[in-house]
């Protein structure tokens, strides 16, 4: 018996009350109760054959026409224009669609939602309420075709993302494969500290505090104990845009970041940094971080190191586009920042640095972040290069190279179908009609 999760849009773009969240979660739980028996059977299902008009090979850029994938359990066993159809196999014909691997977003915030300022969400909403919201956000993301994500900090919810990841892994809730960081790490008075609030209220930072190398190592150990897969560090402070440039102070030296990278590596993890401007981005590159997120205003020296060490930049255009489109007095300034980021991105493309795809979704609605791929193409990157950045570099940042990001035998059967080739129309990735994660259909037609 094959498990099919039907798509219900339960994640809205407006602020949500705890009562509304509970109602939506109850609906989600009722769906799962209806298919609980099927869930147990899904791991022992008969082989599945997916058939579509086209299949995109990501590494080579070649398109197979038609395309077929044979799935046994949670993994792919064969890919080609024609694959074996074992006796008793379930065949799903997706017609004129194009098959490609499930998308990867390496910069998401499951614990943020649209409609309220981030700092107010973290103060006014309890961690249990935010965790319920995160479960719904994860569901919206996977139904949009994102089968793997890196959650870049709970913004004050501590290690609550550990529970979300574990619940998804255990099949209790629908969501992507997650790599989580718990809270990000920040200095006293840094990017995520409660700087604009009454100091007599003693509000906590939205990040874990570490002021030197020793505190960084201790914090990383504590986060690892609580279930974190990787480390997120704020390397630059609040981003001030003056005279057409960013003026963002660095928060850690290269030596301090190197200590963090070494400690993360000791236990099999990596460090990703929020960083814009110099010398913060240079310090991050010198320390050998896994990725530099936002990554605006990179010097030639920084880009040279990023190329040498294969450190991807993660532009996060979509969240900046969102801020630029919001009504209010800040919109014009946000548009200037976005225009500046676009110009800087073109310089980075010319320099040949690697990229990965991360949207910073959370301030804008979960499930809409495929827009990031479209924007990267619009701003000058070739469609195949964007898909390779998303899937190949994304898999590497997830620590899952050789497991996800391509349709190959032995890889997890994380597969989506879109109505046209994204090589011809990158916006096709915003119209996902079919999603399979680990051999289980979570969106789209059932077996014929």
Model-derived features: positions:
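Active-site mouth loops of central-metabolism enzymes
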Residues: 120-132, 198-217
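Divalent metal-dependent hydrolysis catalytic cores, especially in the metallo-beta-lactamase
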Residues: 133-159, 174-183, 228-239, 270, ...
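Metal-associated gating/positioning segment near the N- to mid-region
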Residues: 97-172, 188, 255, 287
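Bacterial N-terminal signal peptides
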Residues: 24-37
């Amino acid at each position: 018996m094959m498990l099919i999760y039907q798509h219900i849009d339960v994640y809205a773009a407006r602020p949500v009350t705890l009562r509304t969240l509970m109602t939506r979660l109850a609906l989600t739980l009722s769906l799962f109760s209806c298919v609980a028996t099927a869930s147990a059977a899904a791991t022992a299902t008969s082989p599945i054959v997916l058939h579509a008009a086209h299949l995109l090979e990501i590494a080579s850029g070649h398109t197979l026409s038609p395309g077929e994938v044979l799935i046994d359990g949670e993994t792919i066993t064969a890919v080609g224009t024609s694959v074996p159809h074992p006796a008793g196999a379930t065949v799903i014909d997706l017609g004129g669609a194009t098959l490609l691997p499930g998308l990867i977003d390496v910069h998401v915030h499951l614990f943020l939602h649209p409609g309220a300022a981030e700092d107010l969400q973290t103060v006014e909403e309890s961690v249990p309420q935010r965790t319920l919201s995160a479960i719904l956000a994860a569901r919206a993301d996977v139904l949009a075709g994102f089968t793997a994500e890196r959650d870049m900090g709970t913004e004050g919810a501590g290690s609550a993302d550990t529970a979300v990841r574990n619940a998804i892994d255990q099949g209790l809730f629908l969501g992507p494969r997650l790599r989580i960081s718990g809270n990000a790490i920040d200095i006293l008075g840094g990017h995520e500290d409660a700087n604009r609030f009454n100091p007599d209220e003693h509000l906590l930072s939205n990040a874990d505090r570490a002021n030197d190398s020793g505190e960084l190592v201790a914090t990383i150990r504590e986060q690892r104990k609580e279930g974190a897969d990787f480390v997120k560090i704020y390397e630059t402070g609040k981003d001030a845009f003056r005279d057409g440039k960013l003026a963002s102070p660095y928060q850690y030296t290269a030596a301090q970041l190197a200590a963090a990278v070494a400690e993360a590596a000791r236990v099999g993890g990596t460090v990703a940094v929020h960083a814009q401007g110099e010398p913060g981005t240079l310090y991050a590159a010198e320390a050998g971080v896994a990725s530099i997120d936002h990554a605006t205003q990179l010097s030639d020296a920084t880009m040279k190191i990023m190329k040498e060490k294969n450190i991807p930049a993660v532009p996060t255009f979509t969240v900046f586009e969102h801020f630029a489109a919001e009504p209010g007095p800040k919109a014009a300034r946000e548009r200037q920042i976005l225009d500046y980021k676009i110009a800087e991105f073109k310089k980075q493309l010319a320099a040949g640095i690697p990229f990965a795809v991360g949207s910073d979704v959370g301030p804008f609605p979960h499930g809409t972040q495929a827009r990031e791929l479209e924007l990267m193409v619009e701003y000058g990157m070739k469609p195949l290069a964007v898909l390779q950045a998303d899937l190949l570099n994304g898999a590497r940042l997830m620590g899952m190279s050789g497991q996800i990001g391509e349709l190959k035998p032995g890889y997890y059967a994380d597969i989506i179908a879109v109505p046209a080739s994204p090589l011809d129309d990158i916006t096709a990735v915003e119209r996902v009609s079919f999603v399979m994660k680990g051999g289980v259909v979570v969106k789209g037609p059932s077996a014929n």
